């Protein structure tokens, strides 16, 4: 393999590091494949070192004097970096904001149903916007909306904390609740405990069942045994 024919970037964008023949410096400080310092070398000699190992010469610090280059398998390096980024994205938690609308005089059954939904939503590590809608003359009784929101706070105290205190916006009074950190930690602890206590995995579908243990042989009859005498 000749190094001049390898370009792991495949003509990629400017974000990628310069590699191999794309490195413009006449001499570079070289770091070996195992992290060892190889000193300052002419670019041709540095490329030859990388070629001997079947690897790439990658410019990792272009602004240094002279630029710093590392011998590595650049294609594999980029693959692992992409894999790490994908795994990090999978671990990111997307927090949603769910709005629940109430009235100053919401019926009890409707209130209970909506509170259950908010409780479940907070339990999934999401946030909730609780909005009290005013109509007509209800605007002159804003204290009723405050009472409704205060009741919500009390009913969800074990699973929620106030992120945004109640305030008016037009004909609406609203607040934003976030999951209670203690509740989320308790859920994580329970999940870990359940995973630790889980029984051993069952045999895969279609796998043969384990053979039954052989039965113990019957004891040999003795001289005193009537069956032996017969």
Curated annotation (Swiss-Prot):
Spell out the residue ranges making up region: Disordered: 1-21, 184-230
Q: Write out the similarity annotation.
A: Belongs to the IF-3 family.
Q: Which GO terms describe its cellular component?
A: cytosol; membrane
GO BP terms, alphabetized: ribosome disassembly
- Check the UniProt entry and state the signal peptide residues, or none: none
| Record-given protein name | Translation initiation factor IF-3
Gene Ontology MF, one: ribosome binding
**Which InterPro entries does its entry note?**
T_IF-3_C_sf, T_IF-3_N_sf, Translation_initiation_fac_3, Translation_initiation_fac_3_C, Translation_initiation_fac_3_N
Q: How does it assemble?
A: Monomer.
Q: Where in the cell is it found?
A: Cytoplasm
Q: Does the keyword Protein biosynthesis apply?
A: yes
Q: What UniProt keywords are attached to this protein's entry? A: Cytoplasm, Initiation factor, Protein biosynthesis
Q: What does this protein do?
A: IF-3 binds to the 30S ribosomal subunit and shifts the equilibrium between 70S ribosomes and their 50S and 30S subunits in favor of the free subunits, thus enhancing the availability of 30S subunits on which protein synthesis initiation begins.
List where Low complexity composition bias occurs: 193-208, 221-230
Biased composition annotated in UniProt, kind: Pro residues: 209-220
Q: What Pfam families does the annotation carry?
A: IF3_C (PF00707), IF3_N (PF05198)
């Amino acid at each position: 393999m000749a190094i001049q024919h390898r370009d792991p970037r495949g003509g990629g964008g400017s974000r990628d590091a310069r590699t191999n023949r794309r490195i413009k410096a006449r001499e570079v400080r070289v770091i070996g494949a195992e992290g060892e310092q190889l000193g300052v070398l002419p670019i041709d000699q540095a490329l030859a070192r990388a070629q001997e190992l079947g690897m790439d010469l990658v410019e990792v610090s272009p602004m240094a004097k002279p630029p710093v280059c590392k011998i590595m398998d650049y294609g594999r390096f980029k693959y692992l970096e992409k894999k790490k980024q994908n795994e990090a994205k999978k671990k990111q938690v997307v927090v949603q904001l769910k709005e629940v609308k109430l009235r100053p005089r919401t019926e009890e059954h409707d209130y209970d149903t909506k509170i259950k939904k908010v409780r479940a939503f907070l339990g999934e590590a999401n946030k909730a916007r609780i909005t009290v809608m005013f109509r007509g003359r209800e605007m002159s009784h804003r204290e009723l909306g405050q009472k409704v929101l205060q009741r919500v706070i009390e009913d969800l105290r074990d699973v929620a904390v106030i992120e945004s205190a109640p305030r008016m916006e037009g004909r609406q009074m609203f607040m934003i609740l976030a999951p209670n950190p203690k509740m989320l930690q308790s859920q994580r602890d329970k999940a870990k405990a359940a995973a630790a206590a889980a029984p051993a995995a069952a045999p895969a579908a279609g796998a043969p069942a384990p053979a039954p243990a052989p039965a113990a042989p019957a004891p040999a009859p003795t001289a005193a045994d009537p069956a032996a005498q017969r």
